[in-house]
Amino acid sequence: MAQSTATSPDGGTTFEHLWSSLEPDSTYFDLPQSSRGNNEVVGGTDSSMDVFHLEGMTTSVMAQFNLLSSTMDQMSSRAASASPYTPEHAASVPTHSPYAQPSSTFDTMSPAPVIPSNTDYPGPHHFEVTFQQSSTAKSATWTYSPLLKKLYCQIAKTCPIQIKVSTPPPPGTAIRAMPVYKKAEHVTDVVKRCPNHELGRDFNEGQSAPASHLIRVEGNNLSQYVDDPVTGRQSVVVPYEPPQVGTEFTTILYNFMCNSSCVGGMNRRPILIIITLEMRDGQVLGRRSFEGRICACPGRDRKADEDHYREQQALNESSAKNGAASKRAFKQSPPAVPALGAGVKKRRHGDEDTYYLQVRGRENFEILMKLKESLELMELVPQPLVDSYRQQQQLLQRPSHLQPPSYGPVLSPMNKVHGGMNKLPSVNQLVGQPPPHSSAATPNLGPVGPGMLNNHGHAVPANGEMSSSHSAQSMVSGSHCTPPPPYHADPSLVSFLTGLGCPNCIEYFTSQGLQSIYHLQNLTIEDLGALKIPEQYRMTIWRGLQDLKQGHDYSTAQQLLRSSNAATISIGGSGELQRQRVMEAVHFRVRHTITIPNRGGPGGGPDEWADFGFDLPDCKARKQPIKEEFTEAEIH
């Protein structure tokens, strides 16, 4: 106990020495200094015991604390020296900031955005861009379509554009023209000239404008060609000039230096020309835009585009009227419904819709109504019947092997004689006169007489050497006839009515779709009155139609047959020529060779001539020989 009391002052001294070595701003603990004497033994002993225990712990703990504190101080000092947030180091320590770089986009802002706006903005001065009245002729160098809001011009040709404002803009205002692509997939590309025009000598020599610029200003030395350093877009700027006295427009002459179809340039991509009214600081006071096309023929392209636009408008209006029908929901057919067969037509999209067509004129309306009814009836006809009809039409439309003469058609040859010879109408039946006599040994020549023998046309020779097989075959009649009406060689309606002396009535028939005499064969006089034909022509036309019906048969008239001795000259009937042009022969020239025996010799008596029907006394008295007369054409 005494030893402990004796060592107490030494322990207190050691603790005070250690305590004094600590920093005064320690935040861990604070011990009061010893101010008591040795008279408080119990308290000193308690304190010495406390110090004794703290002596062993404080030696190691405080040493570690000092080491940790010094390390933290060094780290904090290093961090503070490199931190830009400390105000005392902010001015001295250089920082790697993008704002301090001279090439930063934030340091020098672009006067134009990356994607320029093409929305019309009249602004406070009611900025407008107009064009003069232009022509759509092919020779025009430029033209403007108000319908499409599109400018068409030739390359390097002057295109005047008028600028109008309601109030004068501030001094220093300029007008900028900039081309941009119209479509969204091309709008980020810069519009430039193609390499061919940019590097060529044409339109580049002696020009102050850069070769790559598409738009140039003509006749203004104050124009400036701007290449944006950020977006790369090219534009031309001219100072705004107020309109002259007596005018309300300021005209600027622009040139477009590359075609829209140039490869490597615009390459057929549509462009917009943006005209802006700007101040010196780039503030936009007004904006107008229009589409531009640089081509070789502005008038032609404008007309084609406007026609296409009108067609699209008509289709859009038609679809808008029938919008309810076109928006029907698709319904799948139930499994029980059979699939469409091969003979059933598949309707295209829109076949069930109803469309409207405006027609001017009653006659045009009636024609279109007939077409409509025909098409509707066509849908009711079975497809096999339609195919059969088309095959028949193709057979009827095959060209004939014989070329018709210049003044009348010829009958095509027959391949078969339908119904036999007894069923074919003879020449006498065709002409409508009875034969003078009939004989099995002589052909039925009917009313063939001297008058008919003198008519013009090809002769039909009778060859005695022809066999029966040749006589049974159908021969082609080479008669070139010019028959008078109503037996007209041309089946057209015009020739028929002209032959009747009624050319003024042609329009009454053609307006109703009647183009051939075959369409008139079933008309009555009441039908002619319904067609509004004048009364003075009705009876004439009706009689002509009756003569046609009685004169020849359209379905059987085919061609003339001839034989050497007993063949009947007739026209064969065939259904294959129902719609071909049929010529009806009215006048014939027949040459028949008569062999007269030489009975006028010394041994010939007068009674030998009785069977020939000659006046024998006159022949003997005058001694006139019987001669056969031939024309020069027949001799050669």
Swiss-Prot record:
Composition bias type Polar residues, residue spans: 94-104
PPxY motif, short sequence motif: residues: 483-487
Named cofactor requirement(s): Zn(2+)
Effect of T27A: Impaired phosphorylation
Induction: Not induced by DNA damage. Isoforms lacking the transactivation domain block gene induction.
Record keyword Protein biosynthesis present: no
Textual note on the cofactor: Binds 1 zinc ion per subunit.
Phosphothreonine PTM positions: T27
GO MF annotations, alphabetized: DNA-binding transcription activator activity, RNA polymerase II-specific; DNA-binding transcription factor activity; DNA-binding transcription factor activity, RNA polymerase II-specific; DNA-binding transcription factor binding; identical protein binding; MDM2/MDM4 family protein binding; metal ion binding; p53 binding
Entry comment describing in which tissues the protein is expressed: Expressed in striatal neurons of patients with Huntington disease (at protein level). Brain, kidney, placenta, colon, heart, liver, spleen, skeletal muscle, prostate, thymus and pancreas. Highly expressed in fetal tissue. Expressed in the respiratory epithelium.
Residue ranges of the region described as Disordered: 78-104, 314-345
Gene3D superfamilies: 2.60.40.720, p53-like tetramerisation domain, Transcription Factor, Ets-1
DNA-binding, as annotated region: 131-310
Positions bound to Zn(2+): C194, H197, C258, C262
Positions carrying Phosphotyrosine: Y28, Y99
Cross-link Glycyl lysine isopeptide (Lys-Gly) (interchain with G-Cter in SUMO) residue location(s): K627
GO process annotations (BP): cerebrospinal fluid secretion; digestive tract morphogenesis; DNA damage response; hippocampus development; inflammatory response; intrinsic apoptotic signaling pathway in response to DNA damage; intrinsic apoptotic signaling pathway in response to DNA damage by p53 class mediator; kidney development
Keywords attached to this entry: Activator, Apoptosis, Cell cycle, Ciliopathy, Cytoplasm, Disease variant, DNA-binding, Host-virus interaction, Isopeptide bond, Lissencephaly, Metal-binding, Nucleus, Phosphoprotein, Primary ciliary dyskinesia, Transcription, Transcription regulation, Tumor suppressor, Ubl conjugation, Zinc
Other known facts: Maps to a chromosome region frequently mutated in diverse cell lines of human cancer. Appears not to be frequently mutated in human cancers, in contrast to p53/TP53. Hemizygosity is observed in neuroblastoma and oligodendroglioma. Activated and stabilized by interaction with RANBP9.
Disease: Ciliary dyskinesia, primary, 47, and lissencephaly: A form of primary ciliary dyskinesia, a disorder characterized by abnormalities of motile cilia. Respiratory infections leading to chronic inflammation and bronchiectasis are recurrent, due to defects in the respiratory cilia. CILD47 is an autosomal recessive form characterized by onset soon after birth or in early childhood.
Subunit (UniProt): Found in a complex with p53/TP53 and CABLES1. The C-terminal oligomerization domain binds to the ABL1 tyrosine kinase SH3 domain. Interacts with HECW2. Isoform Beta interacts homotypically and with p53/TP53, whereas isoform Alpha does not. Isoform Gamma interacts homotypically and with all p73 isoforms. Isoform Delta interacts with isoform Gamma, isoform Alpha, and homotypically. Isoforms Alpha and Beta interact with HIPK2. Isoform Alpha interacts with RANBP9. Isoform Beta interacts with WWOX. Interacts (via SAM domain) with FBXO45 (via B30.2/SPRY domain).
Name of protein: Tumor protein p73
